């Protein structure tokens, strides 16, 4: 079972309307690799991808005859790639290739028709690398909307401006959009706690993003059968895989003007499926995830005062100790790094200005957020540090100068 990669879902919208309990499923058999040759296992099988209640994505294979699930792998974004093996004579052999290490799993298609093979392959890669928002599959009515559905350029600003502070906290807090949805996914403990405007977030019932989930074996179900002859197993093929070809997906969706006043629930649904656009070019694009690296954060996290301020924001639970070591583990985890990258992208989009204004941030920070200038926003936040902190920094600098004069 693979446990590397990022846990937080992506903000890329997609077609998630299937009522099936599996995100995608298709009939396929396994293949065994010996040396450089793969040999088909002639059993009837089913490949499916499932998102469990803990939001983890499982790639599974089960025997359709016995109902036994033989492979149940937890996959994180960018862990692996599913692609066709062109060396196979039948052209219907696919490989799940892990980017870290040499692990590869081969499958041969057992669907009677070939016209959906590439579509199944595309969907597998989409769901493995862009998991849907928790609860997005069950949502109805407003899925697929974009911000343009708010009714013009000023729609979002107008809606946010008329919200109370409690409504904003409901929207972007840790419980606002299912714990991991919308803007809550961008910030982990919630945007308010990240910006320092408010107390520590409430304890979440979700497990730590670094915890390993046990393999989930779904109840055995009998897959639907068709009165068509079963496809024949492919001949043994070479397992040599070519370099991955770039895949492309059409994530465009049609926006429609709302027929009635927009409610808070509508905005929540929109944010849960919105795609973060490119920044308007107000400043140089900065990816916070590439700036706040473990090497840069290490000396900062070694400061006892910093540790004391961060401890209340750690995930709480019986198996989650709130220690300085846990701070280090949290901030250096792939999950936190991806969440930081998502927040950086949202900030660079220039759409978070109204939210920053609602939280009473300095005018410089709001202006930078409106422009999508991440670097200017960070500088504005640094300049707006509490007077006590600035006084302490000034005192330390003065002491250093006095020590130098004594030398």
Swiss-Prot record:
The keyword Phosphoprotein applies. Residues 18-131 form the Pru domain. GO terms for molecular function: endopeptidase activator activity; proteasome binding. It holds the Pfam family RPN13_C. Residues 362-407 are annotated as: Interaction with UCHL5. Residues 277-391 form the DEUBAD domain. Its main location: cytoplasm. One of its GO terms (biological process) is proteasome assembly. It is found in: Cytoplasm; Nucleus. CDD domains: PH_Rpn13. The modification Phosphoserine is found at residues 15, 140, 211, 405. Residues 196-259, 378-407 are annotated as: Disordered. There is a cross-link at residue 34 (Glycyl lysine isopeptide (Lys-Gly) (interchain with G-Cter in ubiquitin)). Ubiquitinated by UBE3C in response to proteotoxic stress. Keywords: Acetylation, Cytoplasm, Isopeptide bond, Nucleus, Phosphoprotein, Proteasome, Ubl conjugation. Residues 2-132 are annotated as: Interaction with PSMD1. The modification Phosphotyrosine is found at residue 127. GO terms for cellular component: cytosol; nucleus; proteasome complex; proteasome regulatory particle, lid subcomplex. InterPro entries: DEUBAD_dom (IPR044867), Rpn13/ADRM1 (IPR006773), Rpn13/ADRM1_Pru (IPR044868), Rpn13/ADRM1_Pru_sf (IPR038633), RPN13_DEUBAD (IPR032368), RPN13_DEUBAD_sf (IPR038108). The Pru (pleckstrin-like receptor for ubiquitin) domain mediates interactions with PSMD1 and ubiquitin. Preferential binding to the proximal subunit of 'Lys-48'-linked diubiquitin allows UCHL5 access to the distal subunit. Component of the 26S proteasome, a multiprotein complex involved in the ATP-dependent degradation of ubiquitinated proteins. This complex plays a key role in the maintenance of protein homeostasis by removing misfolded or damaged proteins, which could impair cellular functions, and by removing proteins whose functions are no longer required. Therefore, the proteasome participates in numerous cellular processes, including cell cycle progression, apoptosis, or DNA damage repair. Within the complex, functions as a proteasomal ubiquitin receptor. Belongs to the ADRM1 family. This is Proteasomal ubiquitin receptor ADRM1.
